[in-house]
């Protein structure tokens, strides 16, 4: 009798993806973030679904409906804060997942990598639209400022912004369409995740050494299922600790004030996970230049496969590149800090220097160091 797991048309796909999948025997904890991102997506879709049952996307009642969820719905406060802080944990996992790919050269699977970058854009768009929905001060002004950036596009900019707004300012039409897009995008993301995995399973996983590991593969289950469960438990522990002890730690107090078009908050800033890109945007005095830098700061990830000039795939045996990679990480922390500061001296110049360094490391310094390391191999 044949095993149903290996013959059933549907279960067979699951089997090849999560059970009998040949996996390198030496992948470290840095490879856990893929499954953790899957978990985050499931948490966000489920909590979001229950929030959508009680939320109203109308400028007059949106803020009140969120308050109603927190006060009157059974465990509504828990669902709301799981969704809000779940987004933060989602982005932490995303940044670590991308950083792992950069460090260990996973970007050489360029189909998988490019789908991943598209996923990053989709998640960022979803998170931005989600931030607008509670209709607090930072929701309203964040939406106004960020959508207004599109007016920098020559010729069609102003028309495009008014088309997105559905009027001449951020109002009811904007909120309704943002809710519609915020609801549908996670399902598109889930479909893209399937494509991401499809491309990954065509090539198999990378491993810390960056070497071909075909001769030393082990089945995914039970080895990595157990390993992933540990990651899942730790993620849930961190998320629940954040929710139950300090749910507003990563939020903005201004968002507890209902949106008021007549009163601008002293410092308009996005959620913490966009601050690095926001700092790059602000570091350029020209509007169009800032927008291009903002888009390119993420789009630059797509150039990684082209900028890989080293003879070795991973940075595991490349100490000079490692050093530069960690300087890049420190630079991103600096940009995140600057993005949350007011636009005044010395923050302006620090932001500009950090932005220049960010692009210089990726486009110039890392490829140059790779070539130097290639020369050192011959010594």
From Swiss-Prot:
It comes from the Eukaryota. It holds the Pfam family Cytochrome_B. It is found in: Mitochondrion inner membrane. PROSITE patterns: CYTB_CTER, CYTB_NTER. GO terms for molecular function: metal ion binding; ubiquinol-cytochrome-c reductase activity. A ubiquinone binds at residue 201. Keywords: Electron transport, Heme, Iron, Membrane, Metal-binding, Mitochondrion, Mitochondrion inner membrane, Respiratory chain, Transmembrane, Transmembrane helix, Transport, Ubiquinone. Binds 2 heme b groups non-covalently. The chain crosses the membrane at residues 33-53, 77-98, 113-133, 178-198, 226-246, 288-308, 320-340, 347-367. CDD domains: cytochrome_b_C, Cytochrome_b_N. GO terms for biological process: mitochondrial electron transport, ubiquinol to cytochrome c. GO terms for cellular component: mitochondrial inner membrane; respiratory chain complex III. Belongs to the cytochrome b family. Component of the ubiquinol-cytochrome c reductase complex (complex III or cytochrome b-c1 complex) that is part of the mitochondrial respiratory chain. The b-c1 complex mediates electron transfer from ubiquinol to cytochrome c. Contributes to the generation of a proton gradient across the mitochondrial membrane that is then used for ATP synthesis. This is Cytochrome b. It comes from Marmota vancouverensis (Vancouver Island marmot).
């Amino acid at each position: 009798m044949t095993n149903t797991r290996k013959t059933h048309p549907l279960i067979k796909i699951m089997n090849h993806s999560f059970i009998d999948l040949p996996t390198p025997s030496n992948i470290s904890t840095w490879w856990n973030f893929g499954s953790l991102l899957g978990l985050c997506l499931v948490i966000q879709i489920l909590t979001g679904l229950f929030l959508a049952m009680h939320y109203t996307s109308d400028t007059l009642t949106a803020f009140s409906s969120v308050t109603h969820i927190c006060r009157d719905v059974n465990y509504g406060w828990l669902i709301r804060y799981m969704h809000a802080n779940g987004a933060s944990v989602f982005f932490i996992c995303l940044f670590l997942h991308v950083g792992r790919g950069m460090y260990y050269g996973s970007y050489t699977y360029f189909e998988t990598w490019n789908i991943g970058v598209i996923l990053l854009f989709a998640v960022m768009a979803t998170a931005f639209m989600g931030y607008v929905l509670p209709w607090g001060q930072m929701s309203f002004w964040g939406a106004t400022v960020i959508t207004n950036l599109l007016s920098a596009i020559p010729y069609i900019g102003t028309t495009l912004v008014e088309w997105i707004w559905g009027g001449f300012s951020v109002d009811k039409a904007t909120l309704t369409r943002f809710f519609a897009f915020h609801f549908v995008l996670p399902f598109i993301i889930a479909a893209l995740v399937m494509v991401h995995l499809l491309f990954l399973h065509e090539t198999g996983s990378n491993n810390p050494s960056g070497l071909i590991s075909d001769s030393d593969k082990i089945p995914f289950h039970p080895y990595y299922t157990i390993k992933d469960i540990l990651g899942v438990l730790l993620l849930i522990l961190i998320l629940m600790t954040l929710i139950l002890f300090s749910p507003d730690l990563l939020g903005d107090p201004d968002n507890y004030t209902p949106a008021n078009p007549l009163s601008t908050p002293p410092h308009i800033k996005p959620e913490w996970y966009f601050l690095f890109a926001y700092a790059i945007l602000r570091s350029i005095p020209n509007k169009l230049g800032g927008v291009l830098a903002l888009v390119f700061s993420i789009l630059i990830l797509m150039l990684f496969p082209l900028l890989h000039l080293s003879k070795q795939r991973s940075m595991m045996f490349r100490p000079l590149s490692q050093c530069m990679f960690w300087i890049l990480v420190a630079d991103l922390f600096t940009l995140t800090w600057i993005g949350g500061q007011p636009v005044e001296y010395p923050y302006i110049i620090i932001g500009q220097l950090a932005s220049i360094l960010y692009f210089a490391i990726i486009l110039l310094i890392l490829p140059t160091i790779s070539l130097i390391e290639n020369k050192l191999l011959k010594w």
